[in-house]
Regions:
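Short hydrophobic/aromatic beta-strand or adjacent loop that forms the aromatic wall/cage
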Residues: 20, 99, 140, 173-175
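Basic, often amphipathic N-terminal segments
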Residues: 1-86, 104-167, 185-195
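Surface-exposed, active-site-proximal loop segments in enzymatic domains
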Residues: 98-104
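Glycine-rich beta-strand-turn "strand-cap" elements at beta-sheet edges
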Residues: 90-96, 171-187
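A short small-residue
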Residues: 54, 96-98
Length: 195
C-alpha cells in the first residue's frame, strides 16, 4: 500500500483544499532521501517532515474543481516521457522557510516536464500555488521543516547538513502522483507518464 506523503495533522490542516503534482522516487534517490532524513530527524526529533520523499512540480488551490484539474494533469502526463532524477546536493532554503532539502540536478527530462506543464497550464484558469518561473525553480525533495527552530538551532542543523553529492544517486520515474487534500486527509492517484 502506498504511504501518504504528509501525515502530520498540522500540515494536513495547512494543505486543506490544495492539490499537487509530484514525483515520488522509489529507487536510489528515495534510498538516499530516507537515509539522510533519518540522520536529520535524529538531530531534531520534534521537527515536522514529509513521510515520503517527493518532488513537487506544481501546486494548486482548486478545491471545487479537483476532477477537472485531475483530467488536465492526466492529459499532460500522457505526452511526457519518464523523468530522470539525480541527487546534486543536500541544501537548505533559508529563513523564513528553513527547510533542509535534497537538491536535484536540472536533468533535461525534469526541466522539459516542468516547462511543458507550465505551458499547458498557461492556457487554463486553474489557481496555482507557489509557482515560479523555470529559471528560479529549485528541483528538490524537502527533508525536514525547521521553521519552528531558533536561529541558532537552524544554523547548527543547516551547517551540519549542507553538502555537495558528486555523482549522486539517480533513477528514472515513470509516473506522477496527483495529490489532493480534502476532509483532513490526503488522497492521491498515480498517473503513468507517456500514456
Amino acid at each position: 500500500m502506498k504511504r501518504a506523503i504528509m501525515t502530520d495533522p498540522e500540515q494536513l490542516r495547512s494543505l486543506e483544499g490544495q492539490q499537487y503534482v509530484v514525483l515520488c522516487p522509489t529507487g536510489p534517490v528515495a534510498a538516499f532521501f530516507d537515509a539522510t532524513q533519518e540522520e536529520l530527524r535524529a538531530a531534531v526529533p520534534m521537527a515536522p517532515f514529509p513521510t515520503v520523499g517527493h518532488v513537487t512540480l506544481r501546486g494548486f488551490s482548486e478545491a471545487r474543481r479537483v476532477g477537472e484539474l485531475r483530467n488536465e494533469i492526466r492529459a499532460w502526463a500522457a505526452g511526457i516521457p519518464p523523468i530522470e532524477l539525480q541527487v546534486d546536493a543536500v541544501d537548505a532554503f533559508p529563513a523564513p522557510f528553513q527547510i533542509v532539502i535534497t537538491r536535484l540536478a536540472r536533468t533535461a527530462s525534469l526541466v522539459d516536464a516542468y516547462s511543458s506543464l507550465t505551458d499547458r497550464l498557461g492556457a487554463t484558469d486553474f489557481s496555482r500555488v507557489g509557482e515560479l518561473p523555470l529559471e528560479q525553480w529549485v528541483f528538490h525533495l524537502s527533508l525536514i521543516y525547521g521553521a519552528a527552530l531558533s536561529a541558532e538551532e537552524w544554523e547548527t542543523l543547516r551547517r551540519g547538513a549542507v553538502r555537495d553529492i558528486p555523482s549522486g544517486p539517480s533513477e528514472t520515474v515513470a509516473s506522477v502522483e496527483f495529490v489532493w487534500f480534502e476532509g483532513g486527509a490526503e488522497h492521491s492517484e498515480t498517473i503513468t507518464l507517456g500514456g
